[in-house]
Amino acid sequence: AKEKRYKELQQFEFNPVYFGYNEFTVDSSYTDYLKRVCRILKSHSDLRIKIIGNTDGDGSEAFNLELSKKRSNEIKLILIKNGIRTDRMIEEYNGELHPIDSNDTDEGKRKNRRVDFSFI
């Protein structure tokens, strides 16, 4: 069982959930992916998940921190609707502090408007 678990977790790849400008609504194109995350959490009852909200650099730091919180919370609500208990989730709100690309281009900003995940 340990080997099966290890293999399943090794094969699973987290992808960011991206958001529109000033948006915190999760696009329906992510539904299947988020259900897959929930299936893995359900099949490994000791796993927990960290949900990490991020924004681009537009707007004030305070505004972006709040927006990253809203993005993280939207994901949390989806996981709850799919049967994941809140005590298995940790939320982190980075605002604009951890960009993965430049905030000087539209493409870079798009990549920074995201929620990342990790198992813990």
Task: Annotate the PLM regions.
Residues 25, 29-31, 52-120:
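Periplasmic OmpA-like peptidoglycan-binding domain that tethers envelope proteins to the cell wall
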Residues 1-48:
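Periplasmic peptidoglycan-binding/tethering modules of Gram-negative envelope proteins
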